[in-house]
Amino acid sequence: MAATMNKTPATTFLLIPAAASLVLLLAAAASVEASAFDYAGAFDKCLLFFEAQRSGKLPDDRLVRWRGDSALTDGFSQGVDLVGGYYDSGDHVKFGLPMAYAVTMLSWGVVEFEKEMVDGNKLHRVLDAIRWGTNYFVKAHTQHNALWVQVGDGDSDHLCWERAEDMSTPRTAFKIDINNPGSEVAGETAAALAAAAKAFKPYDRMYSDLLLLHSKQLFTFADTFRGKYDDSLQSAKKFYPSASGYQDELLWAAAWLYEATGDEQYLRYVSQNAEAFGGTGWAVTEFSWDNKYAGLQVLLSKVLFEQGGSAAGYADTLKQYQAKAEFFLCACLQKNNGHNVKMTPGGLMYVSDWSNMQYVSSSAFLLTVYADYLAESRGTLRCPDGEVKPAEILRFARSQVDYVLGKNPKGMSYMVGYGSYYPTHVHHRGASIPSIYAMNATVGCMESFDKYYNSKNADPNVLHGALVGGPDANDAYDDDRCNYQHAEPTLAGNAPMSGVFARLAASPADNTPEYTPAPNAPSPSNGGSPLEFVHTVTNTWKANGVDYYRHVVTAKNTCGHAITYLKLQIKELSGEIYGVSRTNAKDMYEFPSWMTRLDAGAQLTIVYIQGGPAAKIAVVEYKTA
């Protein structure tokens, strides 16, 4: 470790010549190039989130060291071992339906992008994340026609703000059976186990066979004893109600069993029930833990792409599924004759005011896999508003991921721990309370609301990889734990991103960017500065006769050492600024409150909005480790 240095470099101002400014302004909706994003690093963090959500006895080799063992007696009082699985979000309930959906999506990512995960040295970690869920499902499936689908109660759990390691709330377990059916959750669990069986098959054949056995039994249970799970399980209705019913899950489970086994009986099932169950009738603009139709339609389109004429007996029905899949994709791409997914002004798909990012991640996944299906078959997507090539579909999916990672009007990453500017007040109990290893005293149920939930301090534990609910319909985001609709991450929101990150990391940039990149301002000579600045104007608009510009400045640490203290002078700034903290001294700024160092090669992102010319930025003092 180098000795600490305190340097005052020659002052370096960042200036943009008038001609360059004009060029920048002409590049409407300009942005940094896609290659600026580290998709492999984002993939790594995404997997850390699943570690942070683990319930039960944690392994010694875990990477999330602030988490400890928890809920080690789940189910015991009711005569069943339900230790393990995942906590759903910022609370400590184990909801079976969204957990199973998350495992399905993790597994689908492996099915489609196994090679990319192997090449990126991530496959073993994804399989570990899947196995943590499937081991729990196998334990929860205690009889052919019985499945334990929830541990904990949302109402009582939400009355306390405490760490998982200190839980004092009831851990009541709930099951479905022939008298209390739940076809949605039984079907989704069957789908998860079938998808996981295919993912594990090349690496652990015995385990794959075990998962398939349970999947087949659960599908038969779901189909034979049909009924809405939230009619049988009132405690789930308030938190994860089934709006789409159970028929989509029955088709979804059968489709995954066909994908995993090739057994024609499952293809026959989705064909014979296509119309009655809505598979070829529902044209949707969302894909989620509740509504599986778009995912089902894309998955069955794959059969056509792979088998073509050999699926002759089912081709007509499969083409109807494909038509509905392409309705969804065209709606995402804004080429569906007005029947499109809504977009925010900053370019993010917007489906719901509550946890919208879960719809962004699932849509990005379907767009990504379908783009590859088309590319492999040398096909194109024919939308009402024009033909779309596979590369364009992938480009749009990338634009959504890039928005998540920071290419948005706030310049903020909505994935916690990615980049230098991300949410630091996440609606998550474990992240907001000091770790049991840092503060061994038990944290009380109620008093913790005042001390931690309502605290303005940043989270003491960084919940790396957590995809928060995201901004509102106007791209605004309030970094506040109380803002649970937007600040809470979920298993369902994170899971689809695993496969998307794997795919994008394998081809981080393409030759035809979605937007025309703004020319970078000439980089000034470092002149002793530890930072290399690149300035881009990413948006411009007129209000009350004044032209306003959104400026993004990336400051890369090029000094070869981690910077532990930084003082910047920012002159001629008239608007709001994000990514640095104002000091008491005039025009002086330092690291934001959530940041203590800038590693060698890392970037600090500064965003500001103002009318008139750009601000002038200079490094006036810094220290390195």
From Swiss-Prot:
PROSITE patterns: GH9_1, GH9_2, GH9_3
Taxonomic superkingdom: Eukaryota
Entry-linked SUPFAM superfamilies: Six-hairpin glycosidases
Keyword Signal applies: yes
A single GO cellular-component term on record: extracellular region
Locations listed in the record: Secreted
EC assignment: 3.2.1.4
N-terminal signal peptide: 1-34
UniProt similarity note: Belongs to the glycosyl hydrolase 9 (cellulase E) family.
Protein name: Endoglucanase 13
Organism: Oryza sativa subsp. japonica
Lineage: Eukaryota, Viridiplantae, Streptophyta, Embryophyta, Tracheophyta
